[in-house]
């Protein structure tokens, strides 16, 4: 029907057709890549153009962002931490202040208690040093803490034991062991002298210490109260350890008689002139019954040893009313509780 093959195109040969087709193919093949390349270049250009402005714009916001980051890291965090810490501190300070207030309110109470105890002790000591006189019954009441020393007590014991007319002696430890059953009696402390001492002689010695160490002149003025009375000794008994044990003794205590010339002098002058050789001998030894110039009086009472610390500042000081010539290193405190009464004249 139709003519096929190359003979159908009389105006075109095989070579021409092939060349044309190749040229067209090459043109098309080369043209499309160029267009594609141009399109890609245009796209890349647009992309580059779109990418290039951000670097120009980025330097401005980037410092702001860094500043904001630094501000966020520096300022807001301490602001958020400080209120918490401040609140925590405030909450912790309040109970601490309450504890301080409670402790401060408690300490003055304890101090007040101690001060009241000290005041009570001072009142008690003042009571022990009081020396009222009962003129109606001619009795003298003395309850006083006397400072003696081991040296003065030992010398007094030696002088007393040398005397020929020595009475039956009772050891101090024995006296206090017998008195332990008494509820009001205090526990006996250790005495540095192991030698035995009679109870009456001990009270006699204590009374002589009371006479010698009295700062006021009321105690030596007892000579005026017993002046003109009978010189005979009166036997009296004292229940020393009532009601369990009772010790009966007879003792005449002698008190220095002060002349009327010294009584007329003021107390200040008498206090300076009171320490004569006679009073010193009386203070450091037992009173001799046979000594002239002395009056007799009946003593009634008890003597207790009080244990005190050796480092006490009150004991280390030399007081005006302390016994002169005594050692303050090893003091012995005697709690004297006795009465002195003038012997009554015999009834006619």
From Swiss-Prot:
Residue numbers of Phosphothreonine PTMs: 330
Protein name: Spermatogenesis-associated protein 32
Keyword Phosphoprotein: yes
GO cellular component, one term: perinuclear region of cytoplasm
Residues the record lists as Phosphoserine modifications: 149, 152
Ranges that cross the membrane: none
Subunit and interaction comment: Interacts with syntaxin-1 and ACTB.
Alphabetical list of InterPro entries matching this protein: SPATA32 (IPR029297)
Listed Basic and acidic residues bias regions: 27-36
Coiled-coil ranges from the UniProt annotation: none
Keywords, sorted A to Z: Phosphoprotein
Region listing for Disordered, in residue ranges: 27-61, 308-329
Record-level Gene Ontology MF annotations: actin binding
Phosphoprotein keyword on record: yes
Tissue specificity field: Abundantly expressed in testes. Expressed in germ cells, but not in Sertoli or Leydig cells of the adult testis. Localized at the acrosomal region of the round and elongated spermatids at stages VIII-X.
Pfam families registered for this protein in UniProt: VAD1-2
Annotated GO biological process: spermatogenesis
């Amino acid at each position: 029907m139709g003519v096929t093959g190359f003979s159908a195109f009389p105006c075109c040969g095989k070579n021409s057709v092939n060349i044309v087709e190749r040229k067209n193919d090459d043109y098309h093949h080369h043209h499309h890549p160029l267009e594609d390349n141009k399109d890609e270049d245009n796209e890349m250009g647009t992309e580059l153009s779109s990418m290039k402005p951000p670097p120009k714009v980025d330097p401005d916001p980037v410092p702001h962002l860094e500043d904001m980051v630094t501000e966020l890291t520096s300022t807001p965090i301490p602001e958020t931490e400080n209120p918490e810490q401040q609140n925590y501190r405030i909450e912790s300070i309040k109970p601490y202040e309450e504890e301080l207030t409670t402790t401060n309110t408690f300490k003055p109470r304890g101090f007040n208690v101690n001060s009241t105890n000290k005041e009570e002790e001072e009142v008690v000591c003042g009571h022990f040093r009081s020396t009222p006189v009962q003129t109606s019954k001619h009795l003298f009441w003395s309850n006083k803490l006397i400072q003696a020393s081991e040296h003065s007590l030992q010398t007094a014991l030696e002088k007393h034991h040398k005397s020929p007319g020595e009475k039956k002696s009772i050891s101090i430890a024995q006296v206090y062991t017998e008195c332990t059953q008494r509820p009001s009696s205090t526990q006996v402390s250790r005495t540095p002298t192991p030698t035995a001492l009679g109870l009456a002689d001990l009270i006699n010695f204590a009374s002589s210490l009371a006479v010698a160490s009295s700062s006021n002149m009321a105690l030596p003025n007892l000579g005026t109260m017993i002046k003109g009375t009978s010189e005979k000794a009166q036997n009296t008994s004292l229940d020393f350890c009532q009601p369990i044990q009772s010790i009966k003794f007879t003792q005449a205590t002698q008190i220095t008689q002060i002349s009327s010339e010294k009584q007329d002098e003021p107390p200040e002058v008498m206090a300076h002139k009171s320490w004569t050789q006679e009073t010193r001998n009386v203070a450091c030894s037992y009173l001799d019954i046979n000594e002239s110039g002395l009056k007799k009086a009946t003593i009634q009472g008890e003597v207790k040893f009080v244990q005190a610390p050796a480092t006490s500042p009150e004991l280390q000081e030399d007081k005006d009313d302390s016994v002169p010539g005594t050692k303050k290193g090893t003091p012995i405190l005697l709690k004297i509780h006795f009465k002195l009464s003038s012997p009554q004249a015999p009834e006619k």
